[in-house]
């Protein structure tokens, strides 16, 4: 289980998170929804200890992440797969080596036979052919880079998957491919997932519950139906804004 308790964070005079309470149950997929720049990625980085809260606590499986020692934090991170927004692939390494980096057990990482089989399996899980392993990141499309990033995140057989804007920069077709993949991995691997996104439609599709982060606070938490039925002005404002943006995008297309 992941739990944030009254977490606050500011950068200089800008309050990013203000007394945020948030939890994800085992086996659940929760979408953290909100406009760009609202602090969703900051919240996600608290979970893996890349950012420490100014106040409050972050718990993963009952462990207080801000209070873990370096070795304890490394052990916790070995159970968490993180999908970076831009893919964060190393351009000097081929796809095989990029995915291999996700194998968190050092013995398995060094075992080339195990690594080769694991990379092949991860490529299969993200619907990429084995020969993609030989390609360099520069040869991949945007959608393929995203899928390789996901393959690396699952290479260590994590308990948790954290997705930071997995469909950002993709067209609607490739966004649907990634959303379908997130759903399937949840079913096949049984992982607990947090999906950071600004896409209302995608969040409604992949998540068991949605948490709306707006103006530094969690404004609503619930199923897609509950979010749509909310009378909270902040929730309605965000949904109307997303609808307007979708209409404008449709006109451009």
Could you describe each region identified by the protein language model?
Residues 63-64, 112-131:
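Conserved ABC ATPase "signature" region
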Residues 48:
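Helix-to-loop junction immediately C-terminal to a conserved catalytic motif
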Residues 93, 100-114, 125:
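ABC-type ATPase nucleotide-binding domains, specifically the catalytic core motifs of the NBD
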Residues 161-164:
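Catalytic Walker B motif of ABC-type/P-loop ATPase nucleotide-binding domains
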Residues 136-140, 144:
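Conserved ABC ATPase signature
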